Amino acid sequence: MEWVEIDGSYGEGGGQILRTSVALSVITGKPVRIYNIRANRPNPGLRPQHLHGILALKELSNAKIKGASVGSTELEFIPGKAEPKHVRVPIKTAGSITLVLQALLPAMAFIGGSFEITGGTDVPWSPPVDYLKHVTLYALEKMGIKVELEIKRRGHYPRGGGLVVGRIEPWEEKKPLKALKWERIEWFAGISHATNLPAHVAERQAKAARERLSEVYSAPVEIETEVSRSLGPGSGIVVWAETDKLRLGGDALGKRGKPAEVVGREAADELIEALKTGMAADRFLGDQLIPFLAFAGGEVGVSEITNHLVTNVWVVEKFFGNVFEVEGEVGKPGTLRVVKSVL
């Protein structure tokens, strides 16, 4: 049995290495050993939120695992026979639902199945669920991947309680994604939400984002507002630009003492920054597409080459050898090109 050995402290050395490594192990059937997990972080080793994704992939692939405990700095994952399932991931806190899906989606794309995940939908240090639904899944659909995703309930820090359900069909036709630079913006859209808070919070976030986008661009702006109940209060906004290529996004979370207007402008400014580079994908999307691009092929212009992106490319190439060519420096716009897609 030949192991794929991954140094978990490489590059940005975070949970991304775990998510991509274990997902690729399930897809390829190759066992993976990850050592030095988060070695450069203040609290090294596996965190609870990483375990949720790993255990979901274990269930999906009937895997044998060793070292799957909080604080563990080495993990061995030996996948069994993967089969379509309904995977339930109950995160008791505000652990990120979208980060669990970053681990699950690449593997499930090859198998099919459905999922039900509770936890945080809109939490710091992870993509908001509306970004995943409207920006990431839009790009995946262009590559031939069909995912249905429904946000049943929001979950914010610290209590969580969000619920996201969905299903994914097996990836039949792998379509190369060619999207270097956008040429025109068709329109802007977005979702501004307030949970256990007054409706005016969502409305003010939306108004501020709408006004900021309209200062810079003439394309129409339609931002929906959503007011809901859950375990605890929270607010946030995701805005995206529909271009002739892909969608680029920007987002921001509300917090106590931060005016709703600041939240709305922050999301709009993040999107404007990405659009100004002229590239077809924002920095978060570029990074998220890597495991899928390896199989579909193509080339994508990203608004910023990030450490996350470079690390993710490195993990994919640990499994398949030279797959990508990355043009551009970290911190600058660049291009991601598949030189040898994996079949």
Swiss-Prot record:
Recorded hits in CDD domains, A to Z, give: RNA_Cyclase_Class_II
GO terms under biological process: RNA processing
Q: What's a Gene Ontology MF term here?
A: RNA-3'-phosphate cyclase activity
- Catalysis performed (reactions): a 3'-end 3'-phospho-ribonucleotide-RNA + ATP = a 3'-end 2',3'-cyclophospho-ribonucleotide-RNA + AMP + diphosphate
Q: Mind telling me which InterPro entries this protein's record contains?
A: RNA3'-term_phos_cycl_insert, RNA3'_phos_cyclase_dom, RNA3'_phos_cyclase_dom_sf, RNA3'_term_phos_cyc, RNA3'_term_phos_cyc_type_1, RNA3'_term_phos_cycl-like_CS, RNA3'P_cycl/enolpyr_Trfase_a/b, RPTC_insert
One of its Pfam families is RTC
Q: Does the keyword Transmembrane helix apply?
A: no
Subcellular location field: Cytoplasm
Active site, renumbered: 308 (tele-amp-histidine intermediate)
- Keywords for the protein's UniProt record, in alphabetical order: ATP-binding, Cytoplasm, Ligase, Nucleotide-binding
Enzyme Commission designation: 6.5.1.4
Q: Name one GO cellular component term.
A: cytoplasm
Which enzyme type, at the first EC level? ligase
The record lists ATP as bound by 102, 284-288
Keyword ATP-binding belongs to the record? yes
**Which superkingdom?**
Archaea
Q: Which NCBIfam families match?
A: RNA_3prim_cycl
Protein purpose: Catalyzes the conversion of 3'-phosphate to a 2',3'-cyclic phosphodiester at the end of RNA. The mechanism of action of the enzyme occurs in 3 steps: (A) adenylation of the enzyme by ATP; (B) transfer of adenylate to an RNA-N3'P to produce RNA-N3'PP5'A; (C) and attack of the adjacent 2'-hydroxyl on the 3'-phosphorus in the diester linkage to produce the cyclic end product. The biological role of this enzyme is unknown but it is likely to function in some aspects of cellular RNA processing.
HAMAP family hit by this protein: RTC
Q: Which family does it belong to?
A: Belongs to the RNA 3'-terminal cyclase family. Type 1 subfamily.
Designated name of the protein? RNA 3'-terminal phosphate cyclase
Which organism does this sequence originate in?
Thermococcus kodakarensis (strain ATCC BAA-918 / JCM 12380 / KOD1)
